[in-house]
Amino acid sequence: MAVSAALPSDSISTFWEEYPNIRIDAISNYEPPNFNVLDVDLGFTFEPPTGSDLVIVASRNVKYGFMATPEYLKKHGEPKSIEDLIANHRVCGKFGHYHYLKVWKDIMARSPRVCFSSNSNFSVIKILRAGGGIGVLPLQYANDGGLRLLTEIKETPEVTFYLVAHRLTKDIPKIRVVIDCYRKIMMSSWD
């Protein structure tokens, strides 16, 4: 269930213990899922769905923060402002949905020191944990896995995260079970 770095997946083992025959195929995409082309029943998106076949079954605002390893910050110092970050620090980021985070989009566009970008959240997280630079991640990663939330930069970008289902299949029992599991995760406290 790690279909997005914004969604914690701590409860997956209990889900499959209860529903061992349900298979989840995760497809990562920049654009909102095209349910007809991908032949999928539900998906996550940072945009409200368009079209009458899709419905929002859950949504959540996800808060992000600027993060780096303590080792990177010890060696390079913590930026005092967005301008300091842009001018003096290595930036590691994800292209794709980060354009929904306006302050991060501006940093990625203006920084002469973007040293790493990827379409994979997990690659960005791995590079940040290796001391690659400073990035923006959902707050659930703060003080976890070797990353520390920067305290000098006060901006906390936020984006709405939607769980979207196909209107005609959302009430099929095995799909409803997955929807309910994701909804429970989305409504839990994780930022």
Task: Enumerate the language-model features and the residues they cover.
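Central regulatory/effector-binding core of bacterial HTH transcription factors
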Residues: M1-S52
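Short histidine/acidic/glycine/proline-rich micro-motifs that form metal-
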Residues: M1-V3, Y72, T169
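Loop/helix-junction capping segments adjacent to catalytic residues or to phosphate/diphosphate-binding pockets
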Residues: A5-A6, K75, D144, I172
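C-terminal regulatory
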Residues: V37, P49-G132, L137-F161, S188-D191
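A late-sequence structural motif
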Residues: I153-D191
